[in-house]
C-alpha cells in the first residue's frame, strides 16, 4: 500500500506530461514548417529579418491551402486532427498527416524517457532537443541544408540533456571526441569536394560530443548504416550511390536519438553492453 501514492503520482505526471509533450510536438512541427516557408521560401527575400521571425513565432495557425485560420478545438494536438477528420473545414483539402504523427511521437518519446528514468526534467528537456533535431530533418529533407542558426540550440539542449541524465557535464574525453570528428570531417570536406556538405562538418562533431565517449561509436554507426542502406534502396535506377545526395541531417538526428534511447536502457540495466561498461567504468 505504501507504494500506491508513488504509483499514482508517477501516472499523474505521465498523463499531464504527455499533454505537454503533444503540445511541444505541435509547436515544433509548426515552427519547422514556418522556417521552411519564411527562411527558405520566396518570403525570405521580401521580409526583413525582424519581420520574418515575428511572423514565424506570432502568426496564427492557418490552412496551408486557403489560409483559413485554425481555432480550438481543431488546434488541439492529435485530437484536432481527428475532429476535422484530416481535412480543412473551409477548403476540404487534406491536412498533412505529418502533424499528428509528430505530436504522437513526442508523447511516445516522453513516456519512454519518463517511465524508465523517472526523471521529469530530463524527459522534458530532451523533447526540446528532439524539436530542434526535427527542424534539422525538415530543412535537410526539403533543401539539403542544415540550418546553422539551429546548431547552438541543439548544442545547449543536448548538453543540458546529458547533464540531467548523467548528473555531470561532458568532460575532456568528449572534447577529444569533438576534435577528432571535426578534424576527420573537415579533411573529408576538402579531400572529396562535394562528398559532404559543410553543415555535416559542423553538426557531426557537436552531436558526437553530445553522444559522448564511448557512445560516439554507436552514434556513428546508427547514423551511417541507415543512411547507406536507405540510399541504396531508394536511389534512382542506374544512379551511383556516390552521386546521390544524402540528407545526413535526418540520419544524424536518428543516430543521436537512438544513442539516447540506448543510454537510457543501458543506465536502467535493461540493455547490457559489456564493452561500454568497461569503457565507462575502467576500474570495474
What are these regions (language model features)?
Residues 1-284:
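A membrane-topology feature that recognizes alpha-helical transmembrane segments
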Amino acid at each position: 500500500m505504501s507504494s500506491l501514492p508513488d504509483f499514482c503520482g508517477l501516472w499523474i505526471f505521465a498523463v499531464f506530461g504527455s499533454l505537454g509533450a503533444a503540445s511541444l510536438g505541435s509547436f515544433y512541427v509548426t515552427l519547422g514548417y514556418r522556417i521552411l516557408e519564411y527562411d527558405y521560401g520566396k518570403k525570405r527575400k521580401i521580409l526583413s529579418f525582424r519581420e520574418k521571425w515575428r511572423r514565424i513565432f506570432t502568426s496564427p495557425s492557418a490552412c496551408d491551402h486557403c489560409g483559413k485560420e485554425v481555432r480550438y478545438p481543431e488546434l488541439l494536438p492529435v485530437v484536432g486532427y481527428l475532429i476535422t477528420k484530416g481535412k480543412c473545414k473551409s477548403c476540404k483539402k487534406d491536412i498533412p498527416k505529418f502533424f499528428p504523427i509528430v505530436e504522437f511521437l513526442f508523447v511516445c518519446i516522453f513516456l519512454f524517457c519518463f517511465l524508465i528514468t523517472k526523471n521529469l526534467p530530463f524527459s522534458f528537456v530532451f523533447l526540446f532537443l528532439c524539436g530542434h533535431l526535427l527542424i534539422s530533418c525538415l530543412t535537410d529533407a526539403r533543401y539539403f541544408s542544415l540550418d546553422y542558426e539551429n546548431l547552438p540550440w541543439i548544442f545547449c539542449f543536448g548538453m543540458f540533456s546529458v547533464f540531467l541524465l548523467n548528473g555531470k557535464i561532458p568532460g575532456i574525453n568528449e572534447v577529444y571526441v569533438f576534435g577528432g570528428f571535426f578534424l576527420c570531417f573537415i579533411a573529408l570536406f576538402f579531400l572529396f569536394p562535394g562528398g559532404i556538405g559543410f553543415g555535416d562538418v559542423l553538426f557531426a562533431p557537436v552531436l558526437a560530443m553530445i553522444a559522448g565517449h564511448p557512445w560516439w561509436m554507436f552514434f556513428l554507426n546508427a547514423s551511417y548504416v541507415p543512411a547507406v542502406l536507405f540510399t541504396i534502396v531508394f536511389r534512382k535506377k542506374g544512379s551511383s550511390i556516390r552521386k546521390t545526395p544524402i540528407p545526413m541531417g535526418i540520419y544524424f538526428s536518428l543516430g543521436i536519438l537512438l544513442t539516447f534511447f540506448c543510454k537510457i536502457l543501458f543506465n536502467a540495466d535493461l540493455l547490457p553492453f559489456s564493452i561500454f561498461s568497461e569503457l565507462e567504468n575502467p576500474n570495474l
